[in-house]
Design a protein with these regions (language model features):
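Non-catalytic terminal segments and appended small domains
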Residues: 1-135
């Protein structure tokens, strides 16, 4: 496995293979990664899950306890599970896949994060040729 460098990530952004609800800030692009950002679509849910062959929109309907407004100063409750759509979306080519891991800041703040995809079979793994949203 090899990693994309900053210039390769920029090329994917320029070509629309990585795109966002908001413009991608140049500071999000790191030497060998892209910092992902939360959208305003966030839900407190009953349990964590791996999508497998289930649409995430259906899981939201089944597991959602409440919608969380991230447009205001919001305090996320301790020991609760939240599902947030990320601003960034992907149209990966067949020869590129992705791996995600939290920034060290989230660990220092005692926040546990995972990334999931539609029909994903494991946390923090984005399959080759994936097209869709990230959560």
């Amino acid at each position: 496995m090899s990693y994309l460098n900053r210039e390769q990530i920029k090329t994917l952004i320029k070509s629309g293979q990585i795109y966002s609800n908001k413009s991608i800030d140049k500071n999000q692009i790191q030497p060998a990664s892209l910092d992902l950002t939360l959208s305003d679509k966030c839900y407190r849910i009953k349990a964590s899950f791996i999508p497998n062959n289930i649409k995430i929109s259906n899981v939201i309907k089944e597991l959602s306890l409440s919608r969380v407004n991230l447009n205001i100063n919001t305090l996320l409750e301790k020991n609760c599970i939240y599902l947030c759509e990320l601003n960034e979306k992907l149209k990966l080519p067949k020869d590129i896949m992705g791996k995600s891991n939290p920034k060290s800041t989230t660990g220092r703040l005692d926040i546990f994060t995972r990334v999931i995809t539609e029909n994903g079979k494991e946390y923090d793994s984005i399959k080759y040729n994936y097209k869709g949203k990230l959560y």
